[in-house]
């Protein structure tokens, strides 16, 4: 994988939630139910608190959470995959070891190979992990969409 200083670490951290937030138990319950399935989409206009809601809502279930805050710069599939691996390694450093080696061996590691390695590592880890792709609306590259579809 790239040197640690080439990744923006704050993109890999779940946002801090304040204690004085408005309680939204019904929405938090829906998020908790959504963790039982392979995919949960949360949509609303900009500024409606989606990130805050998810950050507050997924802290309770006890499931490890890998967080990746996306932006327009993450439309290159290689960059997206590097950040994806790093986000999962924040949860469990053993996940993505082979994928990191693939990046070191080749700057153009095939997405399917990297993702297959990640899926296998997640299976070996033996526990469910939630992955939050925050601000996914910035992703417009079909190759990144296909990578996410493969992962799901």
Listing of model-derived features with the role each one plays in the protein:
Residues 1-31, 97-103:
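Conserved adenine-nucleotide phosphate-binding loops and their immediately adjacent elements
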Residues 39:
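Walker A (P-loop) ATP-phosphate-binding motif of ABC ATPase nucleotide-binding domains
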Residues 33, 121-125, 151-152:
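Conserved catalytic network of the ASCE P-loop NTPase/AAA+ motor domain
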Residues 6, 10, 26-27, 52-56, ...:
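Alpha-helical sensor/transducer elements of the RecA-like P-loop NTPase core
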Residues 134-135:
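Walker B catalytic acidic pair
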Residues 42:
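Hydrophobic anchor at the beta1->P-loop junction of P-loop NTPases
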Residues 48, 52-129, 138-140:
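Conserved phosphate-binding/catalytic loops and adjacent sensor/switch elements of nucleotide-binding enzymes
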Residues 45:
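P-loop (Walker A) phosphate-binding loop of NTP-binding proteins
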């Amino acid at each position: 994988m790239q040197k640690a200083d080439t990744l923006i670490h704050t993109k890999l951290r779940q946002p801090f939630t304040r204690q004085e937030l408005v309680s939204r138990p019904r929405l938090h319950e829906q998020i908790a139910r959504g963790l039982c399935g392979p995919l949960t989409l949360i949509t609303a206009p900009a500024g409606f608190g989606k990130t805050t809601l998810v950050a507050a809502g997924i802290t309770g279930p006890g499931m490890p959470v890998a967080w990746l805050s996306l932006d327009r710069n993450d439309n290159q599939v290689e960059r997206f995959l590097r950040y994806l691996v790093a986000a999962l390694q924040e949860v469990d450093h053993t996940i993505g070891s082979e994928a990191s080696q693939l990046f070191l061996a080749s700057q153009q590691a095939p997405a399917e190979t990297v993702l297959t390695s990640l899926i296998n590592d997640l299976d070996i880890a033996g526990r469910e992990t939630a992955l939050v792709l925050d601000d996914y609306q910035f992703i417009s590259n079909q190759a990144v969409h296909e990578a996410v579809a493969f992962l799901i």
